[in-house]
Amino acid sequence: IRSRMLRGETVPYIKEVNLPYLRHFEVDINFSLDYKNGRSELVRELVERAVTAKTGGVEIRTLARDDFFLHLCAHLYKEATTYPWIRMKRDMTLYKYIDLYMLLYETTTSAADEIAARAHALGLGTECYFAVSEAVNLFGDESGAGTRILRGLPDVDTNGLFSVISPEEKKEYRYTERDTVRRFFCADREKLLEEVGVWKP
């Protein structure tokens, strides 16, 4: 429990549902945008901009659309670029990429521009660029929203997108395979990493 709380998420809520192909329904509550419980002022800003959405006749509080999208990007980036998640094979979870793809599919040109601007304003350009480019590489970009967002983030160092940190070892690694599809279908992504130096938080 302590480990999970220090990594910015609660212990999952699990309900047995016994549906075909889905025995358990699991809900994670994430409250951090990076590997530790850092950037609390940023999380506070996202929560303060929360909106009320209606779904199934019920009103729920949720993040504003662009903030929700960026939170998904940051969460995906955190897991994909932190060594322990790669070791546990939780770094490229399919449903996270599908969530992003579906949101991109429904995103208008103006909304894509707003996402890029918001990512830049919040200092989440790298996280957004990484997640969007990976989702587009896996599924395509029928709506053009993914490409639009990427073009709106010209300052991102694309060479740095393939860095992985190991907080416990204080080491930095880099992927030797940059092709998203090849990495996704690799059974042991740890073998695709080469150590490149010391990681300084």
How would you name each of these model-derived features?
Residues R2-P201:
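Conserved NTP-donor binding/palm subdomain of two-metal-ion nucleotidyltransferases/polymerases, i.e.
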